A protein has these predicted regions:
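PAPS-dependent sulfotransferases, especially Golgi type II membrane carbohydrate sulfotransferases
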Residues: 1-7, 174-178, 186, 190-201, ...
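PAPS-dependent sulfotransferase catalytic core
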Residues: 1-89, 283, 288-296
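Hydrophobic/aromatic beta-strand patches that form the interior of the parallel beta-sheet core
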Residues: 7, 32, 129-131, 202-204
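PAPS/PAP-binding and catalytic site of the sulfotransferase fold
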Residues: 16-29, 119-125, 145, 200-227
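Glycine-rich phosphate-binding loop used to anchor ATP phosphates in small-molecule kinases
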Residues: 85-117
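PAPS-dependent sulfotransferase catalytic domain
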Residues: 85-95, 142-217
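Conserved phosphate-donor/acceptor-positioning beta-strand/loop module used by diverse small-molecule
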Residues: 110-112, 124-147
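Short beta->alpha connector loops
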Residues: 110-115, 209, 237-241
Length: 296
């Protein structure tokens, strides 16, 4: 096994995290996969359970331990000491989970790690492993919009000085905000790897989570032992949760092209996923549709 006992997922969200968690649970011995932890440990039924959830999220398994709320604020203003304090509190919880489960590898599968907690964890741990879990950006945007999520609950605005990709967001459509978040998270992964302290890293594509060869290659790059991987199916999908199916339509492609016009060419060159990327192919199978590339 790799020297890193702690592996974290860098992901925009709505990208197959539940599916990945199940793959890890089934096929990586000695691994404790945690999906958007810590989750409130609820014991009460019905409406009492809802009240219990609010109480525990406020006072026990808090938004800050999850990576929301004050963590986002601290990241935006560069309060590294606070971020490290929260990360160390999380580490105490994580080590208890490892001890109880008998596992020796903690695999964090959460969109929240790269929203600010990554700064604290990278200071609190000498070495970590990183997995980039990345989905088609337009499908990712569409999936978030179908959920009618509050963007600011889980994200800084593009204007925040703590961002790698800083853009004026005053006239951005909701879809453009999610496209910005996709790009920002992609860049943060690369920044973390370049900064050192990363013992191993790998990438998985959401669309290939049902491809055992692809998944096993990434697990191997992370230095993990695993059993033969078999597809587990798609979990936590929009349709399964009663939302609209995620489809790339003309409006989604138009939103993508508007956003692309905002990107400096120097930034686009840093995002290798977008090299030759053409969301228009998903509309009619037409491979001749243009993808707008900024000129400056």
């Amino acid at each position: 096994v790799s020297q890193a006992s702690y592996i974290f997922t860098v992901v925009a969200g709505r990208s197959g995290q539940a599916t990945l968690t199940e793959i890890l649970r089934r096929h990586v011995p000695g691994c404790f996969p945690a999906f958007e932890a810590p989750s409130p440990a609820l014991r009460l039924p019905g409406r009492l359970g809802q009240l219990e959830h609010r109480f525990r999220r406020r006072f026990i398994e808090t938004n800050e331990l999850l990576g929301r709320g004050k963590v986002l604020d601290a990241f935006e203003r560069g309060d590294i000491e606070y971020l490290e304090t929260i990360a160390r509190k999380r580490l105490r919880m994580i080590r208890r989970d490892l001890a109880r489960s008998g596992a020796h590898i903690y695999f964090d599968v959460s969109k929240f790690f790269a929203r600010g907690l990554h700064v604290g964890f990278c200071r609190a741990l000498p070495k970590i492993g990183l997995l980039r879990l990345v989905r088609d950006p337009v499908a990712n945007m569409r999936s978030f919009l179908n959920r009618s999520k509050n963007f600011r609950l889980d994200n800084s605005l593009p204007d925040a000085p703590s961002n790698i990709l800083r853009l004026d967001s005053r006239d951005m459509a909701p879809g453009e905000l999610y496209l910005w978040a996709w790009c920002e998270i992609y860049l943060r992964f690369d920044r973390m790897v370049e900064a050192g302290g990363v013992a191993c890293s790998a990438e998985m594509r959401t669309e290939l989570l049902d491809d055992p060869v692809h998944v096993e290659a990434a697990l191997r790059n992370l230095g993990l032992d695993f059993t033969t991987v078999r597809p587990v199916g798609h979990l936590n999908t929009n349709i399964g949760q009663g939302f609209r199916e995620t489809r790339i339509d003309v409006d989604a492609v138009a939103t993508f092209e508007r956003f692309m016009a905002r990107l400096p060419g120097s930034v686009l060159d840093q995002i290798s996923y977008l090299a030759g990327y053409n969301p228009g192919r998903s509309l009619t199978g037409n491979t001749n549709s243009n993808m707008l590339r900024p000129t400056a």
